[in-house]
A protein has these predicted regions:
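Glycine-rich, small/hydroxylated-residue low-complexity segments
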Residues: 3-587
């Protein structure tokens, strides 16, 4: 056993580096005469940046297997005006990696209270209560490592220049974060990047590159984030509230040209309560699942540098960026994979929109023969529009599509997509960008195979619901090169069948009639089918329904089996008959 103190030179260096004044320190050591055991306890009393007395104890234990255990307890620490810690406990384990060289194996930290400023605290002043942090490293195959990070906090508050009081700050309760990265190359060092984040020297470009590395510089990435509540006030009044939300993100990154992505989001409830009653809304039971299989993430990442340039650029360039066009062409040529997007919502309430038990899906698949399949579904138990006086019930949409010559269509539509459109506007000349937008649908070669819409249409408030059915099938070929028209091309072929229950127009329920008389929707629907109580010639009566069948062929349009010329002649005959029936004028 031996007792010693830190050297004066080291004390001066610590005082300068940590903004502290060390008043007293003692080192108590226990060691084995044969040198296979050493334990040191360091006790330090110091005054921090705020001149507050603090106590620090550090236990250093050299184990027989050459590993090192480090335990520390800190009463508190005010590093500067923006960084403050209270009641910190920590444990760490170091493993030997060479002669007198050690690498971090694991670390655990807890803090009763912590106040941290990121980016100099301008807009990211963060407060934690009862926070925990865990990090461990395990050796993987060859020079790769497996990293695991856990973080939790009972309370997290975010302040900025406009949210200086606790009542005005965004608050999250019950925050839990888990990140696992398997197969991280040994050359990747996140420490230096996070150090830039803490001292405010991390630029937007550095931040984007850091996130890209965290998500993709590994063989597999698994993460989850959950929170019990989030509250964001406005003008010291409740404004935004989120309850019991969680998300998961899993990435299989072994081959970024054929990556798998799995994303899940669940929200128990979320609402926004602005002062304007018409803008208040609340949603419950929200779920989103996104799966991407064999997706070319590498080609998506190739646009990151262009995105960073877009942030700085404000005007269209004088000439097209060839590197950007090459990246676009490569993206189109190698586009592949399957996607499956599913979303569900138990309820949604807003002044003029009420939804009950809504779900939707969108499945896509690229095929080897330059085809692209897509299948969209939508269902809702109820969708109500109070101001218009109507309600959809048992809504079901089923829409399968097939796109031929999909690569040409992807290239033509590239600049019309929201994300890629922003890139096009800053890396292509205005003339080139406008050309892409104008011709965005010219390469579409689409097959619609019996898309259907079924619903029961009711008034709001509810009275009686009656069925509506729509069936669509068709072919939309590519527009000929010599067609400069912006209109729908003439070579479209297909069928459009609409079936409406007669009772939508003939129901004599007094409550329903009163609602319909004061609804622009019902008035329009009535005028769409009938005029002065007489059925429009585009509809025919079949049993309990009014039906309209529209067929487009290479020879033109047929409506309920009749040509447009037949309908025109019929209209002229009816007009002539009406003129004959008018009483003669008298003097």
């Amino acid at each position: 056993t031996a007792e010693s103190q830190l050297s004066e030179q080291l004390v001066r260096q610590l005082n300068k580096t940590l903004n502290i004044t060390i008043d007293k320190n003692t080192i108590n050591s226990k060691f084995s005469p044969v040198g296979d055991y050493l334990q040191s306890d360091i006790l330090t009393e110091f005054r921090d940046f705020a001149n507050k007395s603090q106590n620090l104890s550090i236990g250093l234990h050299f184990l027989k297997n050459k590993e090192v255990e480090l335990k520390t307890t800190l009463s508190g620490f005010n590093y500067d005006k923006d960084t403050k810690l209270e009641e910190i406990d920590g444990e760490a384990r170091l493993v030997p990696v060479g002669a007198n060289q050690y690498d971090l194996s694991s670390i655990d930290l807890t803090a009763k209270n912590a106040e941290v400023a990121l980016l100099n605290g301008e807009n990211t002043h963060v407060y934690f209560k009862n926070a925990t942090y865990h990090f461990d490293v395990k050796p993987g195959e060859s020079d790769k490592r497996d990293l695991s990070t856990k973080f939790s906090s009972d309370i997290l508050r975010v302040a900025n220049k406009s949210r200086t009081t606790e009542e005005s700050q965004a608050t999250a309760g019950g925050l839990n974060l888990l990140v696992k990265q398997n197969g991280v190359p040994g050359s990747i060092n996140f420490h230096h990047e996070f150090k830039k984040l803490s001292d405010g020297s991390l630029s937007i470009k550095d931040g984007v590159n850091l996130l890209t590395k965290i998500f993709t510089q590994n063989d597999r990435f698994d993460s989850s984030l959950s929170v019990l509540s989030v509250n964001v006030p406005k003008n010291n009044q409740p404004y935004f509230n989120l309850q019991n939300a969680g998300l998961e993100l899993k990435l299989a990154n072994t081959d970024l040209t054929k990556a798998n992505v799995d994303f899940k989001l669940n929200v128990e409830s979320v609402k926004q309560t602005p002062a304007d009653e018409e803008r208040k809304w609340e949603a419950k039971g929200g779920k989103v699942n996104i799966q991407l299989d064999d997706y070319n993430v590498a080609n998506e990442l190739a646009f990151v540098p262009f995105l960073l340039d877009t942030i700085a650029e404000k005007e269209a360039p004088s000439k097209d960026n060839k590197d950007f066009l090459n990246a676009k062409d490569k993206w189109v040529k190698e586009f592949s994979g399957k996607t499956n997007i599913e979303a569900a919502l138990k309820s949604f309430n807003m002044a003029d929109l009420v939804l009950d038990d809504v779900s939707a899906s969108d499945k896509t698949e690229t095929l080897d023969n330059d085809q692209y399949n897509e299948h969209i579904t939508l269902s809702a138990n109820k969708a109500s529009y109070p101001s218009a006086g109507f309600q959809f019930e048992k809504l079901a949409v089923d829409a399968p599509f097939k796109i031929n010559h999909s690569k040409a269509h992807l290239s033509a539509r590239f600049c019309s997509a929201p994300f890629y459109g922003a890139l096009c506007s800053t890396h292509l000349t205005s003339a080139t960008f406008d050309k892409y937008i104008k011709n965005s649908w010219k390469e579409l070669d689409l097959i619609v195979d019996n898309a259907t819409l079924n619903l029961n249409l009711n008034t709001y408030p509810e009275t009686n619901a009656y069925p509506v059915k729509l069936e669509v099938s068709g072919i939309v070929p590519q527009v000929p090169e010599d067609d400069s028209s912006d209109m729908i091309p003439d070579n479209i072929e297909g069928t459009f069948n609409l079936t409406l229950s007669k009772m939508l127009f003939d129901d004599q329920n007094e409550k329903a009639l009163a609602i319909k008389d004061n609804s622009y929707f019902w008035q329009y629907l009535s005028s769409f089918v009938k005029h002065d109580g007489k059925l429009h010639r585009e509809f025919v009566e079949e049993g309990d329904n009014y039906v309209s069948r529209v067929e487009k062929t290479e020879n033109g349009y047929l409506i309920n089996g009749r040509t447009l010329e037949d309908l025109r002649q019929e209209s002229m005959m009816e007009s002539d008959e009406g003129e004959e029936e008018k009483p003669a004028a008298t003097d």
